[in-house]
Amino acid sequence: MLSVLTTAGTGRAQSVMTLHDCMEYAVSHSTKMRIRSAESGDARIARRDAVLAVFTPQVSASTYVYYNFGRSIDPQTNTWFTQTSFHNSYGISAGFNLFDGFRAVNNLRISATGLLISESQEKQAEADICLAVMEAYCNVLYYKRLDDVYAEQVAAAETVLRKAEREEELGRRSHADVVQMEAELAERRYESTNAHNAYRSHLMTLSDLMFWPLEEELVIDPQVPRLPPEPLRAESVVDFALTHDPSLRIAGWQVDNARRELSAARWQLLPSVGLYAGWNTSYYTYAGTQTSPFDMQFRNNGGEYVQLSVSVPIFNRLQGHSRIAMKRNALDRATAVYDQKRRDVGSEVRRAVQDRDGAAVAWRQARSKAAVQEEAYNLNLKSLEQGLISPLEFRTANNNYLKAQADEMNSYLTYLIRQAVVRYYGGVDYLDQ
């Protein structure tokens, strides 16, 4: 687990954010996660609608009111008359598809898979955000460390310059050496300024990824996260990823949906059967005549019906066959995408393991080089103070020391990220590391 050496503070504005804190904050405030969450909500609604379409009928009620002026038919005598009349009707009906080519059943299965796809896309978005935050966080740590190293170099150069100026006054150091040391100090100050600017820039990038409030300063833990446990074997990681990788599972579910849509298109060539039932009643009056009261007409004019409907597709300009052909092509595309995605995931995992192993070797070498260069730097610093080497020779040793420090930090953080990626492919979410 990617633990950190210090803990966060109590207030958010003054708290020290660890790597885990930054990833957690980014996931909970990311607009991408909000979009994915809304899409998952749509998928759940589609799932609910598909369930209702299979198990519940369609029910509707209607009513209308109208006045008739002029010639019309008397509903009592079924003869024409010219009196003004008032009509009011009420009805309720229900319908249920007994057989629709299994369209509703297939839609139910497709919606269930669609919900799984949406939830996996949400998890994939979470992983992408965590990885981006991790990389940005490591960049901030790298440039913060570089900034601190250059600040130490500036302080050391100032100390050496002051000592050289005193030695010049005593006649033990030439003016040319002092000028070279002043130039060295100016160079170190310039590099320190650049490193500090880069640190602030990468800190702003991290803040943007986290959606951190603009009016608040982001303070991260300067301690470097510890290394994860022993690396996982390549084959075990590949086997797990080919079964559980979100993008590959999404591609597999899309193949399943394409196959179901092809089956549904074929079933649409068969007749559809529906059962319908309803009840209606009416009320009417005529100007200048006596009619039955509303409650009596409401009861007496009521009627019911039951309808069995069979629809047989005969000729629809080959639209059914065209739909089948298009769904078959969609299945071929989905299968090809799945095969390509499976190959890509396998290659990505193997490359990630290879990058992790290479980063581990590079880090060990950089650590050894940094230790040697640090010892050489300390010896050269003493030699410079004693006047045994020139400032130009010391600059070369100092540059080698700075480069070794930067390489060690960079290789360590690179190994940290590569190991986290491999562990993610092995089934450990970034937030759980």
Can you describe what each PLM-predicted range is?
Residues 49, 146-167, 194-205, 350, ...:
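Extended, amphipathic, non-transmembrane alpha-helical segments
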Residues 12, 69, 407-433:
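Acidic, low-complexity, intrinsically disordered peripheral segments
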Residues 125-242, 355, 359, 401:
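Periplasmic alpha-helical coiled-coil/stalk elements that build and connect Gram-negative outer-membrane
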Residues 34-38, 52, 84, 98-126, ...:
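Sec/SRP-type N-terminal targeting helices
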Residues 168-172, 384-388, 425:
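A short glycine-centered flexible hinge/capping loop motif at secondary-structure junctions
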Residues 14-139, 273, 277, 318-321:
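Short flexible linkers and secondary-structure junctions
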Residues 11-58, 62, 70, 214-256, ...:
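Bacterial Sec-pathway N-terminal export signals of envelope proteins
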Residues 62-96, 222-231, 263, 276-312, ...:
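Small/polar, glycine/serine/threonine/aspartate-rich low-complexity segments that form flexible
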